[in-house]
UniProtKB/Swiss-Prot annotation:
It comes from Rattus norvegicus. Sequence-specific transcription factor which is part of a developmental regulatory system that provides cells with specific positional identities on the anterior-posterior axis. The gene is Hoxb7. CDD domains: homeodomain. This is Homeobox protein Hox-B7. The keyword Nucleus applies.
């Protein structure tokens, strides 16, 4: 009871809203009336509003795009020409051959160069002296045993030049080749000549005659 009394006393101190504001102070206008006011440009649905026309085109024909094409909608809404939608990639396709690494002209040039190199290699002539085989190797210095050297020195002491028959006999006896016997005697004669430089010219002539005789026997 006391709470109701205090509530009535509180609200009785403030007057009603209708008594405070005079009637007609605020005109009653709805949002639709505000939007349709012709004095406010840009908000009405006038004939010069392209965006509203495009929106109407979007939702015409049952709320879909069946009644109007996309080109027509954008043309009406944004002022684009119909030729703007007919763009193609012809310039890009024309310049693609120059940009792409697989250029047919370059590929043909590389192929011709390769063919010319192969033809030049095939025509290159290789002579026998230019060929190197793995079996051929530098011959090392021949070493003779003590027995072989002793026997060769004995033979050289008796005869400084050997006939072919005698050279073959010594080669078989010492297990050497004829070429090895011949080389050894040549080196031994050179050594002997250096040791006997003080000898007269008669000795040199005699050695030359013996050498010629040995060459005739070899033939």
């Amino acid at each position: 009871m006391s709470s109701l009394y205090y509530a009535n006393a509180l609200f009785s101190k403030y007057p009603a809203a209708s008594s405070v504001f005079a009637p007609g102070a605020f005109p009653e206008q709805t949002s639709c009336a505000f939007a349709s006011n012709p004095q406010r440009p840009g908000y009405g649905a006038g004939p010069g509003a392209p965006f509203s026309a495009s929106v109407q085109g979007l939702y015409s024909g049952g709320g879909g795009m069946a009644g109007q094409s996309a080109a027509g909608v954008y043309e009406a809404g944004y002022g684009l020409e119909p030729s703007s939608f007919n763009m193609h990639c012809a310039p890009f396709e024309q310049n693609l051959s120059g940009v792409c690494p697989g250029d047919p002209a370059k590929a043909a040039g590389a192929k011709e160069q390769r063919d010319s190199d192969l033809a030049a290699e095939s025509n290159f002539r290789i002579y026998p002296w230019m060929r190197s085989s793995g079996t051929e190797r530098k011959r090392g210095r021949q070493t003779y045993t003590r027995y072989q050297t002793l026997e060769l020195e004995k033979e050289f002491h008796y005869n400084r030049y050997l006939t072919r028959r005698r050279r073959i006999e010594i080669a078989h006896a010492l297990c050497l080749t004829e070429r090895q016997i011949k080389i050894w005697f040549q080196n031994r004669r050179m050594k002997w000549k250096k040791e006997n430089k003080t000898s007269g010219p008669g000795t040199t002539g005699q050695d030359k005659a013996e050498a010629d005789e040995e060459e005739e026997e070899e033939e």
